[in-house]
Each structure stands twice: as C-alpha cells, then as structure tokens.
Amino acid sequence: MGKRPKRKIVLFLVEGKSDQEALQLAIPELYDEIDEDIEVYFPIIRKEEEEKGGDITSTNYVNKQGKRYWVHPSNIEEAIYELFLDDFFDKEKILPKDISEIIQIVDTDGAYIPDECVVLDSSLSEEDSPFYKDDKIACLDVDKIVKRNEQKSENLDYLSSCKTIKVKQKTVPY
C-alpha cells in the first residue's frame, strides 16, 4: 500500500457556531477560485468535554486529563491543538502534514481599552455584564474584566506575531 497523497487543507479556527456559519458560506468559494483541490474547514473551539464555543485568548479550560488551566503565550499553541484540532483531526481524518495554513478568527472584546475605561455599574444584571459602550466597558467586577483584558491582549499580541505554529511535530503557517 502506497503513501496517501497530501491534502491541501486550510483551517479557519472559530469561537462559535455563528462565526462558522457566517464564514463557511463565502470563504470556500474564494479558495475554489485559487485551487479547487483546497479543502476549507472551520473547527470550533471545544470548551469543556463536548461543549463547543468560547474564547481561547481570555478564559480557562479543562484539558482531557481534567486539569483546568489558563491560556497564556507560553501554552497557547498547545491549547490550540488540544482545544481546536485534536478531536477535529480524528473526526475528519486529517494529519498535521495536510494543513497548508491555519487562520484564527478572534474578537478583541475590548482587550485594548485602557483600564480606567472599565467601570463598575451595579445596575447591570449578571447576564448583561460586561456591557460594551462606545467609550467604556460597564461591568459588575472591574478587576475581573481588567485581568481578562490583560490576558487576552497578551495572547492576541503573541498570536498576531506568529508566522507559524506547532501542530504536533509539524510547523504550520499561521
């Protein structure tokens, strides 16, 4: 039995179903214009066990061994593999060598807003906090949002500087 031919796969890592649904309408058509052999996929982050959706840059996660951890620049590449790709590769029968490029879609959620623009608003309900305004973020817990923004901006700064990331033992354009 010979070697399986290498596939040309582009992955768009997304935070949730709405991102996936919006992007998978137009993006594959654009790649078809470049090369019809390119396969485009939209894996959604696995938050906990089978729960889908979330933001890898600003929250903590539970790994497959049941350990909860915060994602930081020192472990975000490993977290991307574990939370986006591990189960997805098994399901789609994809090998790291098949990946031509990884593109990650993230939102900033006010990560770069100055700390003094995060303000307490005790009139908000738990469901409405944080509440994003044009010039500030109103919330029930200022320290929590400031820390979230710090973590998120550190991770976004790191990811935006990456030309490649490690996927198992393979280096993939990012």
Please give the residue ranges for each predicted region.
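Acidic, divalent-metal-binding catalytic cores of TOPRIM
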Residues: M1-Y174
